[in-house]
Amino acid sequence: MIKTLDLVPVLPEIFMAVAGLALLMLGVFRKEDSTKSVSVLVILALGAAMVLVSSLGGERLTAFNGLFVADRFAGFAKGLVLVASAIATAMSLPYLEREKIGRFEYPVLVLFATLGMMMMISANDFIALYLGLELQSLALYVLAAYNRDNARATEAGLKYFVLGSLASGLLLYGISLLYGFAGTTSFEGLANLFAGGHDHPIKPNMGIIAGLVFVLAGLSFKVSAVPFHMWAPDVYEGAPTPVTSFFAVAPKIAALCLLVRVMTGPFADLVEQWRQVVTFIAIGSMFVGSFAAVVQTNIKRLMAYSSIGHVGFVLVGIAAGSTLGIQGVLIYLAIYLFMNVGAFAVILSMRQKGRMVEGIDDLAGLSKTHPMMAFVMAVLMFSMAGVPPLAGFWGKFYVFMAAIESGLYTLSILGVLSSVVSTYYYLRIVKVMYFDEPVEAFDKPVGTSMTLVMAVSTIVILAFTLIPAPLVTSAKAAAQVLFPAAG
């Protein structure tokens, strides 16, 4: 029987589920086109969920016999996901109206995907993890192929669905191996078994290690880490641009936070075993992301490889396996959110004679035709490249310092080298905007929502340098929850 008290930690998720179903009904029963009104209500629902998440406070609460956990780490991660989803929904409205593909299902799917992400972040058992992951994935498959009259979008959705199903299979196989050898799917149960705090502690054998590797492979696909990144460039390029902006931020943050919880929870005592795998994936992601982006001509494909590189940097912090490492990861993800939504606001404003353009060369002479847009893009590109004193530099600084503290010197040096390589393609965009002659100006006006997103993201990136304390302290408090002994 479910106690009323048991439902308190799950209030934000219950609210999101009820809101999603209510808005689905509203969209169906309204006679006229309801995309705009449903989108506004979805943004309000995401805001209300944010209030509910923050009202839970920082104490650790569990629900459904320990399947679900709400703590400071979950609160921080859910905050990032809700902000990313709200911004993505706001940015998509003008695009859907211009392209005449506005349907009320779009914002509702974003809401359900976000609900899945929140469930993933709070999962305290592999069954709950899979439930949240699949709810998110099913909504994202539909969003990828949302523009069904476009062959590229349909192809993107199909590729994502086929490869996503394969990744889910790998993940489930890993979970079944872990259950077979350990006898439990609970994070706390597994942690006790490996830590020796159980009547019959077990040593990590080949079955456990194989299960762990399969789980890592399944989750690596969800964050598009090398070598499970094949889908990302095609899906990012083929999907409608607002969908790409959503894919690049919210699901990635949720999956990386889930990976943090899995690695530091049930497998905290197997750090030496999983660190090798995570280090390999991190190095691959950083270098493949950096070198592949150099040759791209389409800005959405470039952003796909850029995000693969960023995942590599985040994995450096996870490989450190310490409070400092996870603090660095959370700071990096918060900065990554604003860098990406700002860059996608510029990409969504790339219109010539009413149609979207996606070539890097189309940005030529932007400093002369749209000086403010060029300034925003330049700040964001410098930040992504990790140029001090911008926020992007500090994000990398924290994860590399954590890696050095954990003795991962080679990983840190390779990370810095790949960061130097990535500087080339970010600065190439700045060079095209400021030193190339304009071919054709972008359409004006840019739109209120885009201008607002560009302004806020630029202010956040510049302000972090001056006042880093709020983010750094909240990230530290969230990270310490996962390491109670070190806290």
Curated annotation (Swiss-Prot):
InterPro entries: NADH-Q_OxRdtase_suN/2, ND/Mrp_TM. GO terms for biological process: ATP synthesis coupled electron transport. GO terms for molecular function: NADH dehydrogenase (ubiquinone) activity; NADH:ubiquinone reductase (non-electrogenic) activity; quinone binding. The chain crosses the membrane at residues 9-29, 38-58, 73-93, 108-128, 161-181, 208-228, 240-260, 277-297, 306-326, 328-348, 374-394, 408-430, 452-472. It comes from the Bacteria. It is a multi-pass membrane protein. Keywords: Cell inner membrane, Cell membrane, Membrane, NAD, Quinone, Translocase, Transmembrane, Transmembrane helix, Transport, Ubiquinone. It is found in: Cell inner membrane. Its EC number is 7.1.1.-. Its main location: membrane. It catalyses: a quinone + NADH + 5 H(+)(in) = a quinol + NAD(+) + 4 H(+)(out). PANTHER family: NADH DEHYDROGENASE. Belongs to the complex I subunit 2 family. HAMAP family: NDH1_NuoN_1. NCBIfam families: NDH_I_N, PRK05777.1-3. NDH-1 is composed of 14 different subunits. Subunits NuoA, H, J, K, L, M, N constitute the membrane sector of the complex. This is NADH-quinone oxidoreductase subunit N. It comes from Paramagnetospirillum magneticum (strain ATCC 700264 / AMB-1).
